C-alpha cells in the first residue's frame, strides 16, 4: 500500500513525502479532530461560586450545579443568593474503591511516560531498550498483560515484604485487545526486589515507573471516602422542576479522603489531591460571605498529544506495539504534523495529503481496512491463510485504482483565492497553492508572472536585486537579459536568475561580511584560473570553483592547499583522527585509515 501510494503522492503533492496503511490512518485521525476544532462554535456560560462560613467558623466553598447560558439568568441567581438564608440540604458520604491498573504494555507505558515524565513515545522506547539490554526489564514491545508464574510469585512476596500482608491482593489480568499477539509478558522488572535501577537519570525514572506499576498491579484497592455537600437558600432542593422565579439551583461541593491507601503505597503520585471538607449537618445554617459569577466559553475538543494518539491507535486496532513510536516519528519527519505545546497539529502539507487520500483512497486508509489487514497478516503467520491468495485479492483492485488516479491534477492546486486579493505584480487574480512552507497565494499567470502573497493576503517580500547580470542568459538581447537576485529558500539565502523558471541559474556561493565570495586562495586544479570557494548546497557546505558554472569542479570539504602524494589531487580537511585526506574518492588516500591496516 505504502509504496504505491507514496509514488502517487510524490507526483500529486511533493517529492519525498509518503503514505501507508498505518501512517495515513494516523494522520487522518489527527485531521478529523482538526476539522472538529474548526467546526466548533463556542457557547457562553457562567460559573457561579459562593464562599460560606459554617456555625463553627469553618469556610466552605460551594458552586452552582447549573451553568446558566445567559447573563440575565446568572444575575438572577446572584440576586436571590445574596438575599436568601442558606441551609445545608444534605451530606452524602460513601466509600469507593480505586483499583490498580494492569501492568504495562507498550502503549500504556508510552502513555504513562508521556503524562508522568514528559517523554515522547520514541524516547520512551529508546530508554526502555537500554533497560532491556541491561537485563533490568522484560521485553518492551508487547501487547500482553500476562506475567509468568515465577515472576508473579516474586512480585507478591515483595509486596508482602515491603508493605505488609494486608496490602497484598493477587490479580490476573485479561488482555482486552482483539489483535493482541501476546508473544511476550507484560513489561516488568526482571528482579522486582530492585526498587531502583538504571545507569542514567532517564533510565532510573522509567524503571521506577515500571516497578511502581508492576507492584501496584498485585496490591489491594485503595479505599476513598467521598463526601458531597449541597445547600440552597430555602433549605429545600430546587434543582428539579423549578417553578417560582425566586428559586435557584442547588450549590454543591465534593471532597475525597483516602482512608486506606492500598496500591497507592507503591505509586504515591497516583494518589492525587485530597480535598477535606468541614463537618456540617443537614439543616445547619451557613452564612454567605461572598459570591461571584465568571463568564466563560465552551472549548473545542483538544488536539491529540503523542500519548493520546498512541491510545487512539491501539483502541482502533491500528499498528502494533513495535510501530506506535515509529508512526508518530514518520508523520513528524514528513512534515505532516508539528508540535503545538504538547499537542500534535496537522500542517498545511499534512492536511493536503490527508484530504487527497481521504477523497481518492478512503477505503485503504480507514480503520477497518487497517485492522482487517492486521488480522490477515496474523492468519498468514498462523497458517490459516495463503500469502499469495490474500495479496492477489487486495492488490488487483488497488493497483487499478492507483493507475486511474494517476490522471488527477496536482493536489497542491487548492482552488481560487478570495477575489479581493490581486497579484502584486500584474494585478491578475490569484489561486491558493501549497508550497514547502505551507499554503500561499500565487498569481494565476504563473510561471509567466511570479507574483505571490501570504495565505492571509499580505504581500510577500520579493527577491532583492544584486545589480549583476546573470552569467547564463546575460548575453541575450536587451530586455530579455536576466538579473541576479537574492532569494530565500529552504536552505537559506541564495542567488539565482530573475528569469526563473526560464533560466535556472543558481549561485550557491556563500558571501563574507562585505558581500564578496568566500574564496580560499587555493587555485582550482581543473580550470587553473578560478579559486576554490565556499558554497552552500542541499546537504550543507561544500567547496567549488569560483568560475562556476563554466567550471563545475567541487569537493566535499575545505581544501588544505596540499596535493595528494599518491594521485596529485587536492587534499581536504578530514576528521579529528584523520585530519587530512585526498579529495578524489577513487584514490586509496581518500580513506587513509584503510591504508594503515
Model-derived segments and their meaning:
Residues 88-91, 100-113, 138-142, 300-312:
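Short acidic, hydrophobic short linear motifs in intrinsically disordered regions
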Residues 6, 39, 121, 140-235, ...:
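Basic, low-complexity terminal or inter-domain segments flanking catalytic cores
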Residues 1-93, 185-233, 247-252:
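Phosphate-backbone binding and catalysis cores of DNA-processing enzymes
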Residues 83-99, 290-296:
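Positively charged, polyanion-binding regions of nucleic-acid-associated proteins
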Amino acid at each position: 500500500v505504502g509504496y504505491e501510494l507514496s509514488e502517487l503522492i510524490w507526483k500529486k503533492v511533493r517529492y519525498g513525502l509518503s503514505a501507508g496503511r498505518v501512517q495515513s490512518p494516523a494522520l487522518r485521525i489527527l485531521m478529523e479532530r482538526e476539522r472538529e476544532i474548526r467546526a466548533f462554535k463556542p457557547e457562553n456560560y457562567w460559573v457561579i461560586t459562593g464562599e460560606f462560613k459554617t456555625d463553627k467558623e469553618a469556610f466552605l466553598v460551594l458552586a452552582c450545579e447549573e451553568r446558566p447560558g445567559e447573563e440575565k439568568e446568572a444575575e438572577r441567581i446572584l440576586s436571590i443568593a445574596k438575599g436568601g438564608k442558606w441551609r445545608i440540604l444534605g451530606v452524602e458520604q460513601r466509600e469507593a474503591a480505586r483499583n490498580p491498573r494492569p501492568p504495562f504494555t507498550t502503549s500504556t507505558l508510552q502513555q504513562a511516560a508521556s503524562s508522568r515524565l514528559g517523554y515522547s513515545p520514541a524516547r520512551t522506547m529508546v530508554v526502555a531498550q537500554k533497560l532491556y539490554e541491561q537485563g533490568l526489564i522484560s521485553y518492551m514491545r508487547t501487547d500482553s498483560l500476562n506475567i509468568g508464574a515465577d515472576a508473579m510469585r516474586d512480585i507478591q512476596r515483595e509486596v508482602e515484604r515491603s508493605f505488609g500482608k494486608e496490602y497484598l491482593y493477587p490479580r490476573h489480568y485479561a488482555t482486552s485487545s482483539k489483535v493482541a499477539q501476546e508473544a511476550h509478558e507484560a513489561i516488568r522488572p526482571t528482579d522486582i526486589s530492585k526498587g531502583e535501577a538504571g545507569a542514567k537519570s532517564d533510565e532510573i525514572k522509567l524503571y521506577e515507573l515500571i516497578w511502581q506499576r508492576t507492584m501496584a498491579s498485585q496490591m489491594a484497592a485503595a479505599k476513598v471516602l467521598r463526601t458531597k455537600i449541597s445547600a440552597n437558600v430555602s433549605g429545600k432542593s430546587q434543582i428539579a422542576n423549578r417553578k417560582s422565579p425566586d428559586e435557584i439551583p442547588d450549590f454543591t461541593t465534593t471532597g475525597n479522603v483516602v482512608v486506606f491507601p492500598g496500591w497507592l503505597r507503591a505509586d504515591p503520585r497516583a494518589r492525587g489531591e485530597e480535598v477535606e471538607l468541614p463537618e456540617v449537618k443537614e439543616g445547619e445554617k451557613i452564612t454567605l460571605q461572598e459570591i461571584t459569577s465568571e463568564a466563560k466559553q465552551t472549548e473545542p475538543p483538544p488536539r491529540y498529544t503523542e500519548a493520546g494518539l498512541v491510545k487512539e491507535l491501539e483502541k482502533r486496532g491500528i499498528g502494533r506495539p513495535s510501530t506506535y513510536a515509529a508512526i508518530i516519528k514518520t508523520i513528524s519527519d514528513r512534515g505532516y504534523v508539528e508540535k503545538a505545546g504538547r499537542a500534535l497539529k496537522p500542517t498545511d502539507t499534512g492536511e493536503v495529503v490527508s484530504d487527497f487520500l481521504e477523497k481518492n483512497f478512503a477505503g485503504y486508509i480507514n480503520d477497518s481496512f487497517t485492522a482487517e489487514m492486521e488480522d490477515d497478516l496474523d492468519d498468514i503467520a498462523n497458517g490459516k491463510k495463503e500469502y499469495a491468495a490474500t495479496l492477489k485479492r487486495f492488490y488487483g483492485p488497488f493497483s487499478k485504482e492507483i493507475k486511474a488516479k494517476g490522471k488527477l491534477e496536482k493536489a497542491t492546486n487548492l482552488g481560487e483565492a478570495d477575489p479581493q486579493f490581486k497579484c502584486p505584480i500584474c494585478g491578475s487574480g490569484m489561486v491558493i497553492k501549497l508550497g514547502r512552507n505551507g499554503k500561499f497565494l500565487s498569481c494565476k499567470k504563473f510561471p509567466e508572472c511570479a507574483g505571490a502573497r501570504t495565505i492571509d493576503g499580505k504581500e510577500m517580500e520579493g527577491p532583492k536585486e544584486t545589480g549583476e547580470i546573470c552569467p547564463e542568459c546575460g548575453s541575450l538581447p536587451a530586455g530579455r537579459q536576466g538579473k541576479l537576485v537574492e532569494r530565500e529558500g529552504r536552505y537559506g539565502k541564495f542567488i539565482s536568475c530573475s528569469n526563473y523558471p526560464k533560466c535556472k541559474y543558481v549561485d550557491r556561493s556563500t558571501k563574507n561580511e562585505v558581500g564578496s565570495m568566500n574564496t580560499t586562495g587555493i587555485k582550482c586544479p581543473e580550470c587553473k584560473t578560478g579559486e576554490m570557494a565556499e558554497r552552500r548546497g542541499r546537504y550543507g557546505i561544500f567547496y567549488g570553483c569560483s568560475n562556476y558554472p563554466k567550471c563545475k569542479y567541487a569537493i566535499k570539504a575545505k581544501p588544505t592547499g596540499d596535493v595528494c602524494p599518491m594521485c596529485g589531487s587536492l587534499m581536504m580537511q578530514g576528521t579529528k583522527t584523520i585530519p587530512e585526506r585526498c579529495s578524489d574518492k577513487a584514490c586509496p588516500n581518500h580513506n587513509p585509515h584503510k591504508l594503515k591496516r
